[in-house]
UniProtKB/Swiss-Prot annotation:
EC number: 5.6.2.4
Pfam families xrefs: DEAD, Helicase_C, RecG_dom3_C, RecG_wedge
Ranges where the Helicase ATP-binding domain occurs: 275-435
Reactions catalysed: Couples ATP hydrolysis with the unwinding of duplex DNA by translocating in the 3'-5' direction; ATP + H2O = ADP + phosphate + H(+)
Organism encoding this protein: Staphylococcus epidermidis (strain ATCC 12228 / FDA PCI 1200)
Similarity remark: Belongs to the helicase family. RecG subfamily.
Motif (DEAH box): 388-391
InterPro entries: ATP-dep_DNA_helicase_RecG, DEAD/DEAH_box_helicase_dom, Helicase_ATP-bd, Helicase_C-like, NA-bd_OB-fold, P-loop_NTPase, RecG/Mfd, RecG_dom3_C
Subunit structure: Monomer.
UniProt remark on domains: The wedge domain within the N-terminus inserts into the replication fork junction, where the lagging and leading strand split.
UniProt protein name: ATP-dependent DNA helicase RecG
Coiled coil: none
GO biological process: DNA recombination; DNA repair
Amino acid sequence: MSKVHLIESPYALDKIKGIGPKRLALLEELNIKSVEDLVLYLPTRYEDNTVIDLNQADDQATVTVQGEVYSSPTVAFFGRNKSKLTVHLMINHIAVKCVFFNQPYLKKKLELNSIVTIKGKWNRNKQEINGNRIFFKDQKNQEDTHLEPIYRIKEGIKQKQLRDNIRQALSDVTIHEWLTDDLREKYKLETLAYTIQTLHHPINKQNLLRARRTYAFTELFMFELRMQWLNRLEKTSDEAIEINYDINKVKQFIDSLPFELTDAQKVSVNEIFRDLKAPIRMHRLLQGDVGSGKTVVAAICMYALKTAGYQSALMVPTEILAEQHAESLIQLFGNTMNVALLTGSVKGKKRRLLLEQLENGTIDCLIGTHALIQDDVVFNNVGLVITDEQHRFGVNQRQILREKGAMTNVLFMTATPIPRTLAISVFGEMDVSSIKQLPKGRKPIKTSWAKHEQYDQVLAQMSNELKKGRQAYVICPLIESSEHLEDVQNVVALYESLQSDYGNEKVGLLHGKMSAEDKDQVMQKFSKHEIDILVSTTVVEVGVNVPNATFMMIYDADRFGLSTLHQLRGRVGRSEHQSYCVLIASPKTETGIERMTIMTQTTDGFELSERDLEMRGPGDFFGVKQSGLPDFLVANVVEDYRMLEVARDEAAELIQSGQFFEQQYSHLREFIKQNLRHIRFD
């Protein structure tokens, strides 16, 4: 079937008036490659040009007012090509002076006794407006409100040009309706054609809100249809491998561990084991706070697979983390399991031998990075795929790994506790196991907040820990200095400063621009206690495990979100020794102050994730752009979570009733298939 579109156009993008080769190239840089892309290129915000009563305006506020020109404008020139135009208006019986800089041409347009609309900053004391825009329209033609769409543009494209291009396209395209009449009527939604038209050219705020609501619901409904359909396919299209593990051997392995499992770990293991025995594929998320022992739970599951004659795979986002997982699992398993590590650094003969052993079944458990999904990586009999920190991988990467075993059980792990609402959006409908309990003997990390001027006191506190034979992390937001962020400390400068204080041999440097080999060398030195202080960016955020490190200083901590701060803090507190985390920050915003306060009040990652989500929104919540979240144009899974739940219920009903698979929905089914490029539906 040919490509299914939401919007169909009778002509190509370059047939629109004003779009020549040069404009076409600029539009392509904005990812606008078709008329459909142009129509769906929605405004990022709206400038409210509603005329207001000046008596109600706050001092220094940006206002839009209308008045009569009662004195001829004057222009004064100064400096080099600079000018100041002054005109007096009568606005609501108030004489107001209006000033425009470097717009002398306005003088000819500002006729005496004419009615004009001006936008600018209001100075109540001076009774003066510093104007930035002027509208020449007769008063009776002014609309009660005027919301002007503002688009993200590039140099070479003007707002008005883009608005005109979109206006022409809208007049000629056909916009298909995805929602049924019953659904629109039930939730009082508009047609999609009217909605898109309104998002580009709203008449008033109420009109815009209705359009936003309709488009958001449509996006959420389409997304949930995909998720519900995929969920149905995953549970019905393939029979799962039934893992007949040897429970006695598994119990012996658990008893041999050098520590006792927490109650939360035991519950999670039992939940996963029930899934492994079930006739449908496991699709479970294991989430737990930093240091809660998720890796041990994963290890027990891998061991169970081994007793049943199956291989396991564990994919992690970084080489450092892959190496640490491999090291800890080799230590846990001893001679009972053959664990192999596959990263981009494994090359040549060593790689060929590893792949040969993987394919003939000699390797029981393969741990690695993106290298696991390369075409030449072939398993003999994989029964369990575990993805750690899944939100850091694209859908495509996860899907390829899963397809290496057609009926494979899947376990996702994350140390970023995800609120239930967001978990559904990121991972789809799946079972969730949560570990909310730390291993015995762990002491809660003591977190404090210090201002920049208290830096020397923080250094003294760190020195005390070093004297006890402990180690420390020092975290910075930037690698090198930035002219845009002059007040933010950078990791290189702080590294050099600490070297002069503690000696070159005692301080290590780690950041994302270093080669994998260099990063590994520094981490190995820190792990072996060859260096005392590791100065780093957030590259240490996930999974780095050095139990002897008991002190962390996070410089310019207000530059990070709560979840990132909590992940960083989790690098300490991994032994029986008391650990400390000091946040150095002088926040200038209420949000920054609130963030620092919350961090000192709780060490509960689940509570922090909820607060972070409220404060930052889903995109920032994970600290990365490619967070695995659906890329909505209008909907926001946090603000619109009630709508998300309604959309999910409606989508589930449509899928479960079987109506979705009737002829009337064939167009919609094909659209969903084509827009889930990384997921197979056959």
